[in-house]
């Protein structure tokens, strides 16, 4: 009762090999017994938004194996649509491909550059993209310049055809492999219906 005082506005999603005749009485017993009112469920916007503008923070700590960890995070408002989520995926994949060549293979400055993005629709429709890597104290400035230069280049010139094709092939293969995975369907349904 403390955790679920009111189930109004809840959406329950089931995926997988489920016999509806077996599921129905379980839903009626366990979910149907949760009280619900006519009052719509709302959330509290605590206004904890990312800081606007550029922020540089440097932290130092003693370590047995000295290293420098670099983390860039870009945020902003963006309509929460499947098309925008897909565009962000293409961008992160294209940057990952470029950094693999320019930062890891050509400079040998890190084991890898992680690039990942996400979108949100509550409390506002936003995106976030993070670029993160570890390196040594001698190479951090040089690698940071390369990372930002590649980002500017893709913003001004767009992605390379080969980056688009590689990403398309990866996404198609990932989708085909995921068709038999419950998690794929759950993520799709949550993305499609989660934002209303």
Task: Give the predicted meaning of each segment.
Residues 6, 11-68, 74-77:
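An aromatic/glycine/proline-enriched structural segment found at the starts
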Residues 27-31, 91, 144-152:
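Short amphipathic C-terminal alpha-helix that caps PH/PH-like domains
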Residues 23, 87, 143:
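Hydrophobic (often cysteine-bearing) scaffold residues that line and stabilize catalytic clefts
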Residues 25-29, 88, 103:
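Extracellular/periplasmic bilobed ligand-binding domains
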Residues 1, 8-15, 67-83, 104-196:
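M16 family metallopeptidases and their MPP-like homologs
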Residues 91-95, 99, 175, 189-190:
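Solvent-exposed aromatic/hydrophobic patches embedded in short alpha-helical segments
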Residues 22, 30-38, 98, 107, ...:
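A generic secondary-structure signal for well-formed alpha-helical elements
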Residues 72, 82-96:
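Active/ligand-binding-proximal structured segments within catalytic/core domains
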